[in-house]
Amino acid sequence: MKILVIGDLHGEKPVVRTRGFDCIVCVGDICGDKKISKLYKEWFKYKKKNPEDSLDVDEFFLSIGYGEKKIKKLEAESLRTGKKILKYLSSFGRPIFLVPGNWDQSYGESRIKDMTKSEYNYFKVWLDRFNGNEINPKLIKGLRNIFDCQFEMHNFMGVNFIGYGLSCANENPVTSLDKESFSKKEFDLLKNSYNKIVDRLINSYGDKNNKLPCVFISHNVPYNIKLDVIKEKNSFAYGKHLGSSVSRVFCLRRKPDLCLAGHIHEGKGKCVLGKTLVVNPGYGKEAKVLIDFDEVSGKVRGVNFL
C-alpha cells in the first residue's frame, strides 16, 4: 500500500505531483488561519502584558474592532478554504483518512465560560476541546471518499486506520508545564478528564481486528520524542516537549505499526517510539510524504519526503 501523507496546510493548497498512491492521510490543520491567528497573537500578547486584566478573549476582540459577526465571517472563510482543499484531494478518487487539527473548528464543547480565570480553567477547557467527536461537518459535507478517523476506526486494504485529532499540547497534568499552579482537587479533576480521553481512544480501537496492521493518525506528534521539541527561540516553550501524551500512550499500549502526525511544524522527520514508526510530514503546501506500507506484515518499506 502506498500512503500519501499531507502535513499541516493552514489553508495552502498542496501540490500533488505523483499519482502513485492508494490512499491519502491528512493530519489536520487543513483550514486557513492567517487572519484569525493574527488576532489570537494580539490577544496572547495583551494577556502577557496584562495578566491581571479580567478582559476575556471575546471582549478583547471587540475592543479592537472584531465583534461576533466579524469573527464568524473569518471562521466561515477559513472553513471554505479548507473545504476547497479537501475537494481537490477528493478529486483523485482515493480514500482520504483524516483527523481535525486545532485550526479546523471542530473542538468539543466545555461548560467553563471563562478560560482565563485560572490555570485550571484554561487547562480544563483545552481537555474538553480535545474530546471533540468529529471533524466539522461543514468541511466534508458533499465530498466523497472522506473518512473521519476521530475516535473511529476504518479498514482499507486490510489495514486499520484510527485517529485522534485536535490536540495542540501535552494533555497530561502530571507532565504539564503548569502543574505547580493546580490545587490537589484541581489536579485530580484534570487527571480524571485526561484519563477519559485516553480510555476513549484505547476503547475505540477495541479488540475486533486489532491484530491487523494499524495506522494511527494523530494531529499532534506523541509527547517526549525528538519530533515534538520546540525550536522557535521566541516561543515560551523553547527547548521543551509539546507533543500529545494521549498519542504517546496509544502508541505504547496499542503498538500501531505507523503513527502519522503533525502540528509541530519544526518537527518534520521520523523516529521510533516503542514499536511504532512516527512520521511528521511538516508544514505547508510542500509538506508531503509517500509511504510504502506492507498491508500484510505492517512493515514500513519506505518513507519518501516529497
Question: Which residues are covered by each model-predicted region?
Answer:
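Beta-strand-turn-beta hairpins that frame and shape the catalytic cleft
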Residues: 1-4, 144, 153-163, 211-215, ...
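Soluble or luminal CAZymes and related metallo-dependent hydrolases
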Residues: 5, 62-84, 131-132, 182-198, ...
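Active-site neighborhood of phospho(di)ester-bond hydrolases with catalytic His/Asp-centered motifs
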Residues: 5-8, 24-29, 73, 96-102, ...
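Conserved catalytic scaffold of divalent metal-dependent phosphoesterases
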Residues: 9-11, 30-35, 100, 104-240
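Core catalytic region of metal-dependent phosphoesterases/phosphodiesterases
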Residues: 11-156, 281, 285
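Active-site-proximal segments of metal-dependent phosphoesterases and phosphodiesterases across multiple
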Residues: 44-46, 50-51, 57-79, 212-255
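Short, conserved loop/helix-junction motifs that constitute active-site signature segments
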Residues: 87-93, 208-209, 251-254, 272-273
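Conserved beta-sheet core of the metallophosphoesterase superfamily
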Residues: 97-99, 118-122, 228-296
